[in-house]
Amino acid sequence: MDLWQLLLTLALAGSSDAFSGSEPTAAILSRASWSLQSVNPGLKTNSSKEPKFTKCRSPERETFSCHWTDAVHHGSKSLGPIQLFYTRRNIQEWTQEWKECPDYVSAGENSCYFNSSFTSVWIPYCIKLTSNGDTVDGKCFSVDEIVQPDPPIALNWTLLNVSLTGIHADIQVRWEAPPNADIQKGWMVLEYELQYKEVNETKWKMMDPILSTSVPVYSLKVDKEYEVRVRSKRRNSGNYGEFSEVLYVTLPQMNQFTCEEDFYFPWLLIIIFGIFGLTVMLFVFLFSKQQRIKMLILPPVPVPKIKGIDPDLLKEGKLEEVNTILAIHDSYKPEFHSDDSWVEFIELDIDEPDEKNEGSDTDRLLSSDHQKSHSNLGVKDGDSGRTSCYEPDILETDFNANNIHEGTSEVAQPQRLKGEADLLCLDQKNQNKSPYHDACPAAQQSSVIQAEKNKPQPLPTDGAESTHQAAHIQLSNPSSLANIDFYAQVSDITPAGSVVLSPGQKNKAGMSQCDMHLEMVSLCQEDFIMDNAYFCEADAKKCIPVAPHIKVESHIEPSFNQEDIYITTESLTTTAGRPGTTEHIPGSEMPVPDYTSIHIVQSPQGLILNATALPLPGKEFLSSCGYVSTDQLNKIMP
């Protein structure tokens, strides 16, 4: 493809020689040459050994010059003299002919100089090189495109200041514009670029272009030699021209202590030594305070200590001695009055009270009370046997209708205890058939009648009458006392909160036992008044020492009903003293267990109560009135 283009160019050149006087032919040749170059810029009309244009420049935008290379001869063929032809590409004047270079000498060898008379700034130029009539190279350009100013002249520098350390200094570099550039009239506006470097360096440091002819250069090292040069170009167009002559700048030594190299503060060395010093101080501190730090990080395990007990006993595991010490000291004794929360209430089957109590002594004792309080039946007992002497603040409203009923209950409690003693005496009289016991019912009857006379009469309200009133009325009749059994079982609870007893095991005893019960009841009445169906162990002890112990000849095994039964204090006391006939020294005290804790719920109406622990021989008995466990009950029972 390149060969055919070359042949076409040669053909056009030959036709131009044949028609040298024809201007249109020359224009066609020039147009063809430039079209070939535009299609393939690397394409040259001549070989690489032929002359070609190197540059065209206008230093002041008024004149310009073009330069080319020398021709190289190859073989026997030699080129003729090189000629430059130019033409102005005026669109309106296509008839203008090609003209030869006006001056081959002023711009130097292998150059053509165009003075101001041949220079037109706004009209493009086309030039070509020919040898023996053949075009070897050509190009088109505008004068504004080839403006390259001459180098600035008269470079110098002045010292501005020196740093406090005497290591760096600032200078001011000045120069003058090219003498042929019309700067004063504004025909050209130039930009300047300054470059500097140390003498031994190869890379130049460039500064930003400026419009002025002076620029400061900062932070130059003292005792160093620098090279400075400047070049210029037309503002916003064109290329930079040649550099000016190199200006050498040498800064003298301002301080005799100034070193050749830069003085750098040894920050890294200071940081390393600082870290090392802090590490050493930290290790010294840890070594001196290691015991205290160890206690802070790993505190010692506290030694087991109990006030009044040797810690060695706990370490050696001597639990028996520890328990003995705990039993001696009052402050370590356990409390037995905690609530039994597993029993919430007792449900009573009182839908048909007449059928349940029909034909029994309880029916005869409480016949009048059931008629008056039948409308109040169906009440649930929420006490569950948990009330003790440690709970004196329980409201009386659960057992009485109003404050008047409270007075009635307080008076009725001693009468009830006395009535139970009378019942026991009557029962023994009927069994023994002894005339000696005939005086007991009379005394009992007189005491009951006297108690009823002294008892205040309450107002007639619902639930105000106690079941013991009916019991005392029945006791006043001598004919009915013979058939009354010993009441030791709870069969019902009235709406007012009183306990209804049922006949239990008969106790055979002599007349002295009857007198003992009467005297014990009278003494208990003098000391305190019982408010509840159960009483505290401390209160029971007040009654026990007065009663003398007698010799019991025979005992009958009490049979406990598995339904509707409460095991009371009297029944368990009788059972505990059953094995063998024993004689007691007069005046000795026999502790009576206090049954205030529910042990087993056998049926909706049957409960078995736990007794508090009796004092063992040689040990102090606990004075609290709390609930006791089954193990303590087993220790008391033989």
From Swiss-Prot:
Residues 1-18 form the signal peptide. The WSXWS motif appears to be necessary for proper protein folding and thereby efficient intracellular transport and cell-surface receptor binding. GO terms for biological process: endocytosis. The modification Phosphoserine is found at S341. Glycans are attached at N46, N115, N156, N161, N200. The modification Phosphotyrosine is found at Y487, Y595. The soluble form (GHBP) is produced by phorbol ester-promoted proteolytic cleavage at the cell surface (shedding) by ADAM17/TACE. Shedding is inhibited by growth hormone (GH) binding to the receptor probably due to a conformational change in GHR rendering the receptor inaccessible to ADAM17. On GH binding, phosphorylated on tyrosine residues in the cytoplasmic domain by JAK2. PROSITE patterns: FN3 (PS50853), HEMATOPO_REC_L_F1 (PS01352). Keywords: Cell membrane, Disulfide bond, Endocytosis, Glycoprotein, Membrane, Phosphoprotein, Receptor, Secreted, Signal, Transmembrane, Transmembrane helix, Ubl conjugation. It is a single-pass type I membrane protein. This is Growth hormone receptor. Receptor for pituitary gland growth hormone (GH1) involved in regulating postnatal body growth. On ligand binding, couples to the JAK2/STAT5 pathway. A motif (UbE motif) lies at residues 340-349. The chain crosses the membrane at residues 265-288. Residues 151-254 form the Fibronectin type-III domain. GO terms for molecular function: cytokine receptor activity.
